[in-house]
Amino acid sequence: NICKLCSFKTTSKKLNMKKVFFLVATVLFLGCTNNGVENDCFPFITVNESVNLDLPQFIDLQVPGGWAYTSGGLQGLIIYNLNGVQFKAFDRLCPGQNPSSCSQMTVDSNLRILCQCDDSEFNILNGAPLTEGVTCFANEYLVDNLNGSLLRITNF
């Protein structure tokens, strides 16, 4: 009988350890989140666009400081040539706005990105808000310069 009691205690300890392990694993699993940047200002959309800089509609993108609009994203994209090699791309949807006729951002002559819904302005170099009280940045996408004349625009 003593051997059966010892066996019961060992089995009981194993069951308790399994419960503890399961509980810890569950807490760790549920407590983990992705390491991506949370963006409450825009709904998520997969972006995978190609832009051929040799096409006539993108001739302004061939020089540093040039910019152009193209399709893609939530309401189109703004592409900006930083220095002849590096490019920036931003969604034309105004941060924090639902798609509408006033929520498609434009670029002004001072190279600011403008939202006419709330008169907010954004820096074309990094998407930072220039308007006091605005906390959301313009939604930026990753631009890969594949061969000097072909750009690939995707989510980060």
Please tell me what each predicted stretch does.
Residues 3-6:
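Cysteine-centered motifs
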Residues 13-20:
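Positively charged n-region of N-terminal signal peptides that target proteins for export
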